[in-house]
C-alpha cells in the first residue's frame, strides 16, 4: 500500500513538473517574448539654436524672412503668421503654405479660412471619449493668440505651437485646488502675511463630496483679493495650470495642445516633420488625428492643372472640375488597417493605395508630396474649388490612435487606445524642374523614381542613362495552382485531403505547349506546393505536397525555366494563416482588436451582411491575421529551410500586399512598428539567396523585389476623380518587372483590350492555370477560381504574349519618362531610350503626329522608325 502511495505521489510530482515545464515554455515562448522589439527603428531630432533669419541680399518674397537656401530653392517665413513660402530659383515661382489672399476668399466662411491659414489641425476626443467635430487649428488657436515661437535649425526653422484658449475670467486664480494643495498654499501665504492667509482661506470652500476646494466666486472683487494673497508667494501661470490639473475637478484644465513642426530645406525639396513625441495634450483631450499643410501649393479658380492622388495605379482630379457637390477624395495609404476601427463590414471595394505620394501640377509649378515617415498612419485627402473655398488642394492626415465603437446593453460606447503612436509625421515636397512643355504628372513620376533610386529603394535593370534600343523578350507570368484542399469522407467521417490540380510533370507539359506557341520566357508562381496545399500550415516548416511530385522534379522545373530566362517562385503566406493551419496557435499568435479583445480574422465578404469574415461554407477560407510580434519566427525559419530547396525564389502572397497592427491591450504594436518588423523580414528573406516576388507591391517592398504580380493597373472611380493614370508603372518600369491581375481571373476579359492595356502600362501578361479542369475546385475554398483550365486559355496566353512582346521587348530596361493623350482615345508613351509607343483605344482609325493608327491598335517607333 505504501509502495502504491509512493508511486501515486511520484506520478503527481512528475505530472506537476511536466505541467510546469509546459507553462514555462508557453509563457516564455508567447507572453514574455520581446525579440520583435529589436526591429523597431529609433529616430533623433535635429539640434536647434536661437532663431535668427538669414541675410537676404536679393529678397524674393516681400514681407517674409529668409530662413534657408539651397542651390534650387529659398525658404521664407512670415514671422507674424507662420506662413511659409518656397521660391524656386529655376523658374521664379513662389509656393505658399497657404494662399496669401485667403482673407479675400468670398467662398470660404470664417471656419474654413482658419483651416486654410493653419499649418496643422488637431482632431481629438474629449474626456468622455466623444469626438469633437471642430479641430484645434494652428492659426485660430495659436497664431492668432500669439502662442508660437521659432528656433533655428540647420537649413530650416522649428515652429512650436501652443494651441488653446487660455483666457480665464479669474486670470491665474485657480477655480479648484486639491485638499493637499490648498493646505500647502494656505500655510505658505499665512507665513508670509497672516492677514492675506485669512483672506485666502475665506474665499475657498471645501467640496467634501468631490474631494477638492472651490473658489467661492469668480466675481472681480473676489478674484482681486485672492490674487493679492497669491502674489505674496510668487504664484505663477505654471503653478496655475499645475494646480488645476492636480485638483481632480472635471473640466478644470482647459483643452489645449502643444505641437512642434520642423521645416527644413534639402536640395530641391521642402521637408515638414511633426514628431508625435512632441505632441502634448491637456484637459482630458485625446488626439486621434492630425492634418498637415492642407493648402500647401493650393491652386485657385483661374488656374489650370490637376491634383495627383495615389488611387490604385494613380488618378487625376482636375482643377475646378465642377464636382464640388460630390464627396471629397480620401484614401488610406496601404489600405485601411483592419485593427484600427473594429468595423467588420465592407460595403465597397477600393483599389488600394500602394504609394505614399500625392501631387499638384499647374502652369507654373509641379510639386510631388512624399510621405516619408508615418506613411502607415496616413491618408491622402483632396478637394476641388467651390466646395469649401476658392482653391483646389491635396494634403495628408495621420491617425494616431485607434478607436472602436462597442455595443453594450442596447447602447454604444467608444473605446480609444490610451497612447498615441510614436512616429515622425514627415512629408517631403519635391519641386519638379520645368520642362519645355511645362509641368506634368510624368515629371512627378520621374521625381519619385529618382528619389527612390537615390535612397536605394529602386535599382535600375539597365544603365541609368540608357540611350540604345535593345531587344529582350518579356516574361509571361503564370500562377500555377498545385495542391488544393477538398472535403472527402471515409466511413461517414469528414476530412480534408489534397487534390493535385497541377503536378510538376503536368506543369512541364503546360510549358511545352507555351513553347510551341512561341512563348520562350515564363515566370511561374507555384501555389499550393507545400504544407498541405494552397491554404497551407504554419510556414516554419516545409513539407512538400507529395502528390505533386518530388523535390528533384520541382528543382528540375526551376532549372528549365531559368535556362530560358524565366524563374520559378514558390508561394507562401506569412501574415495570414488559415483557420485550419496546423502548427499555428490562433488565439495567441494573432492580432487582437483593442476594444473588444477579439482575435482578428478575415475571410470573404458575405453578400448579405457585408461582413468580411464569411467562410461561405469552407472554413479554410477564414484567416487569422498574424501578430507582427511573431512574424519573424516564421520568416526566419522559412528562409533557413528554403536554402535546401534549389528554386529561383519565394513568392510573397501577403507580405508586400497588406499591413496590420496588433491592438492587444497589454502589448500594442502600432502599424508603424509593424512596418519596421515587415521591412526587417523582407531583408531576412532577401538575404536568404532567393529572389523575391511580391503580390500587390506596396512601395516599402520595392527595395527587395525582382518581380511584382497583381500590381495596381486600375483606379477606383470616385465621383471627384476625373481619370486614371499609370503613375505606379511610370515609377517602377525599368527597375522591377511587373504584371497586373491574372487576365483570366476577372469577368470582363477582352483579348484586344488586354493587349492594348498591357502595352500602354508596360505590364506583362499574367494568367492563372491548372492542368485539371477548374470544375474540380467547385466544392473547395478556391471555388472563385472558376476559369483556370489551361487548355481553354492557351491560345489567348500565346496570342496576348506575342502581341505585347512585339511592343515591349524594346523597353524592358528603359524608364517610362512621358505619357500624354495627344487625341481622344489615343495614348503616347515615351521611354528613356527614345522608343515611343502609340495606343489607339478607339473603334476607328486615328491620325496623330502625322502617323496613321488603325482602330484598336498600337504602333511602336524605335529610333524614329
Q: Which residue stretches match the model-derived regions?
A:
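An active-site-proximal structural segment forming one wall of the substrate-binding cleft
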Residues: 447-458, 503-506, 510-513, 626-650
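Conserved, mostly hydrophobic/aromatic
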Residues: 72, 274, 514, 758, ...
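Aromatic-lined carbohydrate-binding/catalytic grooves of carbohydrate-active enzymes
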Residues: 471-559, 564-630, 657-661
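N-terminal accessory beta-strand-rich subdomains and adjacent acidic, glycine-rich linkers
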Residues: 10-12, 21-468, 855
